[in-house]
C-alpha cells in the first residue's frame, strides 16, 4: 500500500512561529511531525508516499529528501493555494499516487501501532473507503464529527451529534476517487467527498484509534515538547 501525506498547510493559528517555518516540520518530542508520520507509515507497510506541499514547500522537501532516510520512496506534488484536503489528494493522484492508499496529514501523530492497525483493518475490510475515528481529542469546531453504525460511517456531522471525531486519517479506494471531483468550494474537502460517497451507496468503514497529538497553537508547541507541562495544566 502507498500513501498521500498532506503537508501544504501554513498553520495560521501557530503564528508567528509559522511565519518562518511550515507547520509540518515543527516538532513533537523534538522531532519533525511529518517525519514521525512517515516513519509510522513505513511501519504500517507503506513503502511509497506522495507528499503534497505548498506553504514554504522547499523547507518540507529539503527535510524529507527522497525518503530514503525513512525507508519510503517519496514523490512530491505542489498545492499552490490552500484549496482543501480533497484538492490536495487529487493533486497527489495526478502526480502518480495509486489507490488503494492511505491519506494522512503531515501534522498529526498517532499512538504507536495505531496507523498500522488502521492500514491492516482497511485492507481486510475491502471497502471503498475508511475513516479513522477517535474520542480524544473530541469533536469540536475544527474537528468533524462522525456518526457510526456497526463499524460503518453513516454521516459526517456537526460535533454535537456524536462522541467521535475524525482522526485525520482516511483509506481511499479506487471506487471513491470519482467523488473527489465536482465538490462545492474552494475549499474542497475530503469530508464532503466521503459524505457524497456514502450518500451514493458506498460503504465507508470506521476504525477507532487512540488519542492523537497535533499542533494547533503555540501552547501546543510547548506542551508537546515538554510533557511535564502538559501534566500540570
Where are these regions (language model features)?
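A generic "binding-loop/recognition-motif" signal
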Residues: 10, 21, 56, 211
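A structural signal for short hydrophobic beta-strand segments in well-ordered beta-sheet cores
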Residues: 25, 145-148, 206
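Conserved beta-strand termini and adjacent loop/short-helix elements that scaffold enzyme active sites
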Residues: 54, 77-79, 132, 159, ...
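Short beta-strand-to-loop element that shapes/binds the nucleotide-sugar donor at the catalytic cleft/hinge
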Residues: 129-146
